């Protein structure tokens, strides 16, 4: 049986479990498997790119909502500039004043990314990042991981059922 959709995956899990008393918990087993895969999987299919326009004088912009881990931050200028990550403490120590210029470093504070020196002109930043797994549901029947690695979903969900 192919389990290429959430519905088919639930059916396959019910068949493997062969226990009617666990059927109502199958969505929970899938959710628990997704939580673990989100922490541990690092596949090419999870890589994404996002751009952000940095206005003159704007230090912070929102991060993508599906971001799990940043791989690279760059300023799309000529020449291209790859930025270095700094802890928030080091970020403010390195550039203690609000002077403007071309960003050299970035930091993460909550759901935002900050740039120092603060841009003195409008720039475009590109963030290459690993995304969280989009959760399966009755309204989201498939995702990249289920399409490319259905066995990971089956194994992960079954292992949660047997814990």
Per-region residue spans from a language model:
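Glycine-enriched, solvent-exposed interface loops adjoining structured elements
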Residues: 1-163
């Amino acid at each position: 049986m192919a389990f290429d959709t959430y519905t088919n995956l639930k059916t396959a899990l019910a068949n493997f479990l062969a226990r009617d008393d666990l059927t109502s918990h199958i969505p929970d087993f899938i959710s628990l498997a997704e939580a673990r895969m989100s922490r541990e999987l690092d596949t090419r299919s999870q890589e994404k790119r996002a751009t952000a326009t940095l206005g003159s004088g704007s230090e912070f912009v929102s991060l993508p909502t599906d971001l799990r881990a940043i791989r690279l931050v760059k300023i799309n200028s000529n020449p291209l500039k790859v930025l270095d990550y700094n802890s928030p403490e080091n970020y403010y120590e390195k550039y203690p004043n609000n002077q403007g210029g071309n960003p050299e470093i970035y930091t993460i504070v909550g759901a935002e990314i900050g740039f120092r020196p603060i841009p003195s002109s409008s720039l475009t930043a590109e963030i290459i990042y690993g995304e969280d797994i989009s959760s399966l549901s009755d309204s989201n029947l498939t995702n990249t991981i289920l399409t490319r690695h259905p066995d990971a979903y089956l194994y992960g969900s079954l292992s949660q059922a047997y814990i």
